[in-house]
Amino acid sequence: MSPLMRKRTSKQAAPSDVEARLAEVAAAFEHGELEETLSRADALLAEADELPEALHWRASALAELGRLDEALETYGRALKVAPDDLELMLAAAECLVARVGDDREAVEDGLALCARGRKLSQRTGDTELLFEFLLLEGIGLNQVGECARALVSLDAALEHLPGAVEARLERAIALFELCRFAEAQTAFEEILGDSEDEPWAHHYLGLLAERRGDAKEARRRFGQAQALVPEEFPPPVELGEKAFDQAVEDAVKALPGHVKKYMDNVTLAVEDLPKDEDLMGETPPLSPCILGVFRGSPVSERHSILGGFDPYPASIVLYQKNLERFAKTREELIEQIGITVMHEVGHLMGLDEDDLWQRGLD
């Protein structure tokens, strides 16, 4: 992947051969010679440690090598030197959102860069980079569950480039997450009409078929996605009813003692998938891919309900198909069942999503 960088002339006073040496760094990167890219960029930085182009290439190579902490530190150095460099800003945001995307704080930092870059792109009239910032913003907002806001960004992106498959795909995912299933179905089918080998479109059409109860179509779609990108879509781990129930029972037994006493009045159930009414009973709707849900009043609120008696007993539901699809191995599935039980028990205890995220139970 090439960094989001255009050829430009350094604004710093630098040796006359800087541009030629930067071209050599770029060539090394384009040929996949990442260590050579680092070596050449570091040699330039030894002579001019605030050369933004060299910092950009260095950060890009580090990101490709998976050395993300170093990449982000280097992007930070570069942005201090060139705070209004849109391509640099976009590359840093892409690293935060697309590469460190399982870290909510990183995604939010990336979204802040997207917002700034979007405004600067509008001001300068750079519609190409404006599209990229809007697309990345939509991806990041989907990742943190802000799917309605993601739709706004993605619709704006598609105004600039209506046929962009990546933006259309991300928009369709937002529709799915917002439980607008008929619109999502149409959107994914239209994407496949233009790009028949788009694996995520097949995967989501499989999820939609599964929700409709069309097991044959779901298997066909999941199979197509797996055939296209097997490492991205491994077959789900299936425990079977008895083994799954045992894993849930073990997870409850592992709860801290001071929590177990509250579980006596909680119904714990396992269902294949969340029902539409359960998802759309919240505003915004819950994700169709949720692993579990807590229903009822938290312990902290029960004392105010009829003198402590809650006429609507609390319940926790785990969704087996979503959990099995989430995990890559049997061990990972059993671990995730435990985490999900703890997550929903956290809601029982009155913790919100931010509290749970801070405790690593998101």
Q: Residues of each region from the PLM?
A:
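TPR alpha-solenoid repeat register
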Residues: 54, 88, 126-127, 133, ...
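TPR/TPR-like (Sel1-like) alpha-helical repeat modules
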Residues: 112-119, 193-203, 207-234
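Canonical positions in the second alpha-helix
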Residues: 43-44, 77-78, 116-117, 123, ...
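Alpha-helical segment of the N-proximal tetratricopeptide repeat
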Residues: 14-53, 57-64, 91-105, 136-143
